[in-house]
């Protein structure tokens, strides 16, 4: 046996091993090699039909939210495939076609049809034109679908408001929506509901039946209703015959109109019953329950009588008088309506008295000739009319008395206030309040009897009101971050918004006219000369000293009109200043300045650089507009964030109210209003105010000083002191003096092109109202209006219709959302207007109810 060597490698090591081949012979055998098979080929062939159906299927959503395939039929799939093949074939032929230019399009290569039409020449027909134009009224015709849509919309509206619908064909059918069986359902008026007992309780034709079926399809129409759940008061209700369960009779048209029951079986009102069934049938009307409750409680609740009662009055007339009394005392549209009862209970006492008075008077007129038979009813209604007769209360007198002595609680003013309140309440006073009023009247009688003399007033010769030599310390002018490197006040954003004052209430000084054209300031009772001419400084010292003397104007001495008092005590900030000897301090020459605002009344005056206008020219207040310097001085104490709103309020709210040459009291009142919105202005320093008793005028000194001298000087130096004039109880002549006002010719204050542009001028009331109406129906305009001019919301109180439209469109809610985090005062205004709209809506409901009751 031969031995061979075999080599085996382990990495880089070779091993040689001997071996001997087998002694058996070689056998040759062919092995069958299986061909490679695609494992998913059979699966794809099996699923090809399913995948083809899913390819053309659409997806639909079931009621439970599950998505499922909606498969096409075999015929639809064949049509879809043929359409796709035809589209691919046409696209292939189009792509492979030779390029060509289309220059003409014809019908089958022929001429257009218009070429073969005979052309008849047009000739003029000479006729007399008709003067009267005939109006052709088109007949409105509705298709079946439009008619069904109209009925559905009417049904939706009436079911929501519990209204009624009348179907008119050959006869009228009244359909009323009521709350029955836990939902709103339609009900018809049957014969037994009107007191008639007939074998057929309700008749209607096929057209009415179809319309009733449409009107009765309200919410829960398909819900199951069992006959045992139907009770008294459900007569005439229209039910779904397919969803009705229990023992009931025949019906038609898919409707079941409830009539009554007999031996446990419910009957349709359209069914014809026998006379025996009619006599023993239990009708489902509320009338039987009403009479049952009346009969059961009449004998139990009646009072004992001292005579033997007889039947002397007709029963029908007694029923009519009972209805008359019910509507006179407890008016309602339906006696079973809880809403009518709640509205009656919610009436204020004054409104209830007015309602009873009117209904008692109507009851007397309705009683008519029967008052001789029903004398007790007539006497009761006469007494009720007299007791509830409204008293004509004059609120103006009450307000006048309250403003005069309302805050005084010492005698005899306390007793007068008690009587004032007593007369205001009128017939609503209780027995205790009558007793208190009589005691107050007794105290007043004793006081008047024992009074012998008035309290002696103090002598004006002892009046002193010295002007402090110390200057007021202004925080805003002393803060480092409000000053520049030269210690001048920085206006910041206030300078930009102050342009609303300069563009509307100031005018540029024209150098061509000269300073002399602006020296005379006119007011209603005279003139005052400014020292603007002294801006041209003479170099001659004697001439300069002569100009500094001014023009002296003699004023009367210190008298009662120089003072202001309250409760017998002087209010010194509202009085003229005096020297130590009691004589008045007279104003001296005030030199002019160039582009400065002069503030401060005590000590040294403060000079603040004026905000820059649109040009580098000098600015002077328009004639009669000097008081605008008060608001310009208040702007110093307003933060930069509120400067825009402040200037707009002054422009749009204060100036229109002040009018031409307002009184000092009106100016103080507007300052008090602005202090509520911007509390920081309470200590704002004012320009010096000069008092001219001869012309009864207060002059606000501006940057151009005053050439006229001799005026008295008002002590008020801050806004909080000026506000003291806004008091009706302040005894002062100065508060009625004129200060300044709107010029006669200022056309740019009438309207504005763009109410949203920065620095836009004031709008008139009509223009602002038109803009507000425009914003109601344009949300973008209203949103911008709320951001720029939110106080225009207050104009909505001019009309209840505007107020309700803004409330229904959610404008007040939008205003609250926009301003609740920015300025709560505006959000509060929007909330108050929203609450007012709710009260207007309730008032309209009460008026509508009263009209319905009067018409009943």
Swiss-Prot record:
Report the Gene3D superfamilies cross-referenced here. Answer: Helper component proteinase
**Reactions listed under catalytic activity:** Hydrolyzes a Gly-|-Gly bond at its own C-terminus, commonly in the sequence -Tyr-Xaa-Val-Gly-|-Gly, in the processing of the potyviral polyprotein
User: Whose protein is this, by species?
Assistant: Potato virus Y (strain C)
UniProt EC number: 3.4.-.-, 3.4.22.45
Q: For the Peptidase C6 domain, which residue ranges apply?
A: 618-740
Q: Which family does it belong to?
A: Belongs to the potyviridae genome polyprotein family.
Q: Give one GO biological process term.
A: proteolysis
Which Gene Ontology molecular-function terms are recorded?
A: cysteine-type endopeptidase activity; serine-type peptidase activity
Q: Where is the Peptidase S30 domain?
A: 141-284
Thylakoid as UniProt keyword: no
Q: Where is this motif: Involved in virions binding and aphid transmission?
A: 592-594
What keywords is this UniProt entry annotated with? Host-virus interaction, Hydrolase, Inhibition of host innate immune response by virus, Protease, Serine protease, Suppressor of RNA silencing, Thiol protease, Viral immunoevasion
The record, for InterPro entries, names: HC-pro (IPR001456), HC_PRO_CPD_dom (IPR031159), HC_PRO_CPD_sf (IPR042308), Pept_S30_P1_potyvir (IPR002540), Potyvirid-P3 (IPR039560)
Q: What is the name attached to this protein's record?
A: Genome polyprotein
Q: What class of enzyme is it?
A: hydrolase
Q: Does the keyword Cytoplasm apply?
A: no
Q: Where is the active site?
A: 192 (for p1 proteinase activity), 201 (for p1 proteinase activity), 235 (for p1 proteinase activity), 626 (for helper component proteinase activity), 699 (for helper component proteinase activity)
**Site (Cleavage): which residue positions?**
284-285, 740-741
């Amino acid at each position: 046996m031969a031995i061979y060597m075999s080599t085996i490698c382990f990495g880089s090591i070779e091993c040689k091993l001997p071996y001997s081949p087998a002694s058996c012979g070689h056998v040759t055998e062919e092995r069958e090699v299986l061909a490679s098979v695609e494992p998913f080929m059979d699966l794809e062939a099996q699923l090809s039909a399913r995948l083809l159906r899913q390819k053309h299927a659409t997806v639909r959503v079931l009621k439970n939210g599950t998505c499922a395939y909606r498969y096409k039929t075999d015929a639809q799939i064949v049509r879809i495939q043929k359409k796709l093949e035809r589209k691919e074939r046409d696209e292939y032929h189009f792509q492979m076609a030779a390029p060509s230019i289309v220059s003409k399009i014809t019908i089958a290569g022929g001429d257009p049809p218009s070429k073969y039409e005979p052309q008849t020449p047009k000739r003029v027909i000479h006729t007399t034109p008709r003067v009267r134009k005939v109006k052709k009224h088109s007949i409105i015709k509705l298709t079946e679908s439009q008619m069904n849509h109209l009925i559905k919309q009417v049904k939706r509206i009436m079911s929501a408001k519990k209204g009624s619908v009348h179907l008119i064909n050959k006869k009228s059918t009244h359909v009323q929506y009521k709350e029955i069986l836990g939902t709103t359902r339609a009900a018809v008026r049957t014969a037994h509901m009107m007191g008639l007992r007939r074998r057929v309780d309700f008749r209607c034709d096929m057209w009415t039946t179809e319309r009733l079926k449409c009107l009765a399809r309200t919410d829960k129409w398909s819900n199951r209703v069992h006959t045992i759940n139907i009770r008294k008061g459900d007569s005439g209700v229209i039910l779904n015959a397919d969803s009705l369960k229990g023992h009931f009779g025949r019906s038609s048209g898919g409707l079941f109109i409830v009539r009554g029951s007999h031996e446990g079986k419910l009957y349709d009102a359209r069914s014809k019953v026998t006379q025996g069934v009619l006599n023993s049938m239990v009708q489902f009307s509320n009338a039987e329950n009403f009479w049952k409750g009346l009969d059961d409680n009449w004998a139990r609740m009646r009072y004992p009588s001292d005579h033997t009662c007889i039947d002397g009055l007709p029963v029908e007339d007694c029923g009519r008088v009972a209805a008359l009394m019910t509507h006179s005392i407890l008016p309602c549209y339906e006696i079973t309506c809880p809403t009518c009862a709640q509205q009656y209970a919610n009436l204020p006492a004054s409104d209830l008295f007015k309602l009873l008075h009117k209904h008692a008077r109507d009851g007397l007129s309705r009683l008519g000739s029967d008052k001789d038979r029903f004398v007790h009813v007539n006497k009761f209604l006469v007494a009720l009319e007299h007791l509830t007769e409204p008293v004509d209360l004059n609120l103006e007198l009450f307000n006048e008395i309250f403003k005069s002595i309302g805050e005084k609680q010492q005698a005899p003013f306390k007793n007068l206030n008690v009587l004032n309140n007593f007369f205001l309440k009128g017939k609503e006073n209780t027995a205790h309040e009558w007793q208190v009023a009589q005691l107050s009247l007794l105290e007043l009688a004793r006081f008047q009897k024992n009074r012998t003399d008035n309290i002696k007033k103090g002598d004006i010769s002892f009046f002193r009101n010295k002007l402090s030599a110390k200057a007021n310390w202004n925080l805003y002018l002393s803060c480092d971050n409000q000053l520049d490197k030269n210690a001048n006040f920085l206006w910041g954003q206030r300078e930009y918004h102050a342009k609303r004052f300069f563009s509307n209430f100031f005018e540029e000084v024209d150098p061509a006219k000269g300073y002399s054209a602006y020296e005379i300031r006119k007011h209603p009772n005279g003139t005052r000369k400014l020292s603007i001419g002294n801006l041209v400084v003479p170099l001659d010292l004697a001439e300069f000293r002569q100009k500094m003397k001014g023009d002296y104007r003699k004023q009367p001495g210190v008298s009662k009109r120089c003072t202001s008092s309250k409760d017998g005590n002087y209010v010194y900030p509202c009085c003229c200043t005096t020297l130590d000897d009691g004589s008045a301090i007279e104003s001296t020459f005030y030199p002019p300045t160039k582009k400065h605002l002069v503030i401060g009344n005590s000590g040294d005056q403060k000079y603040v650089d004026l905000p820059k206008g649109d040009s580098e020219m000098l600015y002077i207040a328009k004639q009669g507009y000097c008081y605008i310097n008060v608001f310009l001085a208040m702007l110093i104490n307003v933060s930069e964030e509120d400067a825009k709103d402040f200037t707009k309020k002054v422009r749009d709210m204060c100036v229109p109210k002040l009018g031409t040459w307002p009184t000092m009291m009106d100016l103080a009142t507007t300052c008090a209003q602005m202090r509520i919105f911007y509390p920081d202005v309470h200590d704002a320093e004012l320009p010096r105010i000069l008092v001219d008793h001869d012309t009864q005028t207060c002059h606000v000194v501006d940057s151009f000083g005053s050439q006229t001298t001799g005026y008295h000087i008002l002590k008020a130096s801050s806004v909080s002191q000026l506000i003291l004039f806004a008091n009706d109880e302040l005894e002062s002549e100065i508060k009625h003096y004129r200060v300044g006002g709107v010029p006669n010719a200022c056309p740019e204050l009438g309207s504005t092109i763009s109410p949203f542009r920065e620095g836009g001028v004031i709008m008139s009331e009509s223009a602002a109202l038109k803009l507000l109406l425009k914003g109601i129906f344009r949300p973008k305009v209203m949103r911008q209006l709320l951001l720029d001019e939110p106080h225009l919301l207050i104009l909505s109180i001019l009309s209840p219709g505007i107020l309700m439209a803004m409330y229904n469109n959610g404008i007040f809610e939008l205003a609250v959302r926009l301003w609740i985090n920015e300025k709560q005062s505006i959000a509060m205004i929007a909330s108050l207007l929203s609450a007012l709209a709710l009260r207007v809506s309730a008032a309209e409901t009460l008026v509508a109810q009263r009209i319905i009751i009067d018409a009943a």
